[in-house]
Amino acid sequence: MTKPVLQDGETVVCQGTHAAIASELQAIAPEVAQSLAEFFAVLADPNRLRLLSLLARSELCVGDLAQAIGVSESAVSHQLRSLRNLRLVSYRKQGRHVYYQLQDHHIVALYQNALDHLQECR
């Protein structure tokens, strides 16, 4: 017996009740979902992703980051502020220079996993 194939716009209505299954399922809390949405919204900017790609390799100052992605230091500082607010990057001051690095290994893993996924889908 073959499974039916759905055409665009078709839906399937489940037969029977699924109360037992549904009672065991639990979605994340609304406030957690909101935090995740804000997190991914910050990552939705191409220049921020380019900055993360550079910081995944090395600690860099604002001037180096600006030159590497071809935007002003002011624009880089603005993007870094958004990343810093979500604790994706941290910084240290050395004299007049401020050096940025990714906050922790979770950010590197998230970035690398997303890249791997995109390459597998090609």
UniProtKB/Swiss-Prot annotation:
Changing C61S: Does not abolish zinc binding or metal-induced derepression. It holds the Pfam family HTH_5. Residues 62-81 bind DNA. Residues 28-122 form the HTH arsR-type domain. It comes from the Bacteria. Keywords: DNA-binding, Metal-binding, Repressor, Transcription, Transcription regulation, Zinc. Changing C121S: Does not abolish zinc binding or metal-induced derepression. The keyword Transcription regulation applies. Zn(2+) 1 binds at D104, H106. Zn(2+) 2 binds at H117, E120. Changing C14S: Does not abolish zinc binding or metal-induced derepression. Coiled coil: none annotated. SUPFAM superfamilies: Winged helix' DNA-binding domain. One of its GO terms (molecular function) is metal ion binding. InterPro entries: ArsR-like_HTH, ArsR_HTH, HTH_ArsR_DNA-bd_dom, Metal_resp_trans_reg, WH-like_DNA-bd_sf, WH_DNA-bd_sf. Homodimer. The zinc ions are bound between subunits, so that residues from both subunits contribute to metal binding. Transcriptional repressor of the expression of the smtA gene. Binds two zinc ions per dimer. The complex of DNA and SmtB is dissociated by zinc ions. PANTHER family: ARSENICAL RESISTANCE OPERON REPRESSOR ARSR-RELATED, HTH-TYPE TRANSCRIPTIONAL REPRESSOR CZRA. This is Transcriptional repressor SmtB. It comes from Synechococcus elongatus (strain ATCC 33912 / PCC 7942 / FACHB-805). The gene is smtB.
